[in-house]
Curated annotation (Swiss-Prot):
Protein name: Protein TusB
Physiological role: Part of a sulfur-relay system required for 2-thiolation of 5-methylaminomethyl-2-thiouridine (mnm(5)s(2)U) at tRNA wobble positions.
Keywords of this entry: Cytoplasm, tRNA processing
Gene name linked to the record: tusB
Residue stretches in coiled coil: none
Protein localization: Cytoplasm
GO cellular component: sulfurtransferase complex
A Pfam family matched in the record: DsrH
Length: 95
């Protein structure tokens, strides 16, 4: 499953998402959700301890002035890769 997180980690229940995610899933942070991938944040630690792969939409990082502040452990992707993720996963859940 592809989980898309578009809200700030301070305005959504990421712990509930993380209880559902498995190693076969991908998590994509976009819009205000990119805040969850800030270096040294508690939210990032939770995301990285989960078996799902973590992706961050690069255009949204740039739009929020967060270039250089996102963890190297999260994979920055383009819209093209976002489309690839949607094609790979038959199911998607917006968080």
């Amino acid at each position: 499953m592809l989980y898309t997180v578009s809200h700030s980690p301070y305005h959504c229940d990421l712990s509930a998402l993380l209880r559902l995610a498995t190693s076969e899933d991908d998590i994509l942070l976009l819009q205000d959700g990119v805040i969850a991938a800030l270096k040294e944040s508690e939210t990032l630690k939770l995301l990285l301890n989960n078996p799902a792969s973590l992706f961050v939409l690069e255009d949204d990082v740039i739009a929020r002035g967060l270039v250089g502040q996102i963890s190297d452990n999260a994979t920055l992707i383009s819209y093209t890769h976002f489309v690839d993720l949607t094609l790979r996963h038959q199911q998607q859940l917006a968080w």
